[in-house]
Amino acid sequence: MGRPYVTLNLNGMFMDKFKPYSKSNAPITTLEKLSKALSISVEELKAIAELPLDEKYTLKEIPKIDGSKRIVYSLHPKMRLLQSRINKRIFKELVVFPSFLFGSVPSKNDVLNSNVKRDYVSCAKAHCGAKTVLKVDISNFFDNIHRDLVRSVFEEILHIKDEALEYLVDICTKDDFVVQGALTSSYIATLCLFAVEGDVVRRAQRKGLVYTRLVDDITVSSKISNYDFSQMQSHIERMLSEHDLPINKRKTKIFHCSSEPIKVHGLRVDYDSPRLPSDEVKRIRASIHNLKLLAAKNNTKTSVAYRKEFNRCMGRVNKLGRVAHEKYESFKKQLQAIKPMPSKRDVAVIDAAIKSLELSYSKGNQNKHWYKRKYDLTRYKMIILTRSESFKEKLECFKSRLASLKPL
């Protein structure tokens, strides 16, 4: 017989497929090695670490549906660059994720090599055909992930040690906890239960249950009606308690197909594949109808408000595409007929963006990461000008100016 709980990594070593692991066994121990891995100089790494805390993170308050406020932070540009590199060069490149984790999981780094998009739709699909579902919500997840958990992620999964380890732990936390709004936080949150979560999943599978976690949402399902989840819920609560992670009792519930259609991450799972609830499709249709009425009014399609409403509506239609809904192509075609149109305001915004690039280029910044982002964003802003012949001359002028400002 084979070994059902292990798989071979790239180095030919047997790895537990219920735990995340690194493709590389080479330890990163010094700032010099970290600098090489991230392509950021040691001097720059030190300069970023020495930024005042209130410059690294700027507090923002976002209203929640229940009337309370969510505290998030925006990053200093240099912190954003550093954390982006950590994500790209370490989490995305090196970590192989077990199949029960969804959200911040690159599809290419799947332990099953399935190359499936690991988003909320794929997560819901794992539970299709369920007749009883347990949902456990972790309360204020990021705010309760202590630096000790962050350290264990970098040290035990990624073999990062010594001064490189302490540096990364400091960069990825604020006041000893993970930061809501930091680029690295969702990866850390996805990985931080690695030491014990695999054992809970094994227990679930032995009982014929399906276990998934999408960041802070744990879902366990059974194809048996009125399944008793008390033992499994106890295992999950113990796992979270051991990591000092509180459960949101209000959002932790058991759902039965006999009483209502079962939904996971907003999608119905009482079919062979995930479906949007019928009332959601009706709301999308109504939204398109209202947008058409708005588009018929003079100059509306050039307004900021219309553009915002169009993008929101397109996002909802794209959800239909993700679940292969029969109305997707029809709704998309209707929206494409009423796209937002350019205005003189767009010309002014693009002109200002190119002037800013010209100034940055003259100062020799064309090899900087932030310069490339500004350049790409400016090109993106120009797309809307292609929708009107009236702006053809301006568009060609902008293209000509940008051609001499390419990043290195």
Swiss-Prot record:
EC number, UniProt record: 2.7.7.49
Tree of life domain: Bacteria
Reactions this protein catalyses: DNA(n) + a 2'-deoxyribonucleoside 5'-triphosphate = DNA(n+1) + diphosphate
Alphabetically ordered keywords of this record: Antiviral defense, Magnesium, Metal-binding, Nucleotidyltransferase, RNA-binding, RNA-directed DNA polymerase, Transferase
Domain Reverse transcriptase: 43-269
Pfam families from the UniProt entry: RVT_1
Gene Ontology molecular functions: metal ion binding; RNA binding; RNA-directed DNA polymerase activity
Any single GO BP term: defense response to virus
Binding site for Mg(2+): 137, 216-217
UniProt record similarity statement: Belongs to the bacterial reverse transcriptase family.
Matches recorded under PANTHER family: NUCLEAR INTRON MATURASE 1, MITOCHONDRIAL-RELATED
Name recorded for this polypeptide: Retron Ec48 reverse transcriptase
Native source species: Escherichia coli
Gene (UniProt): ret
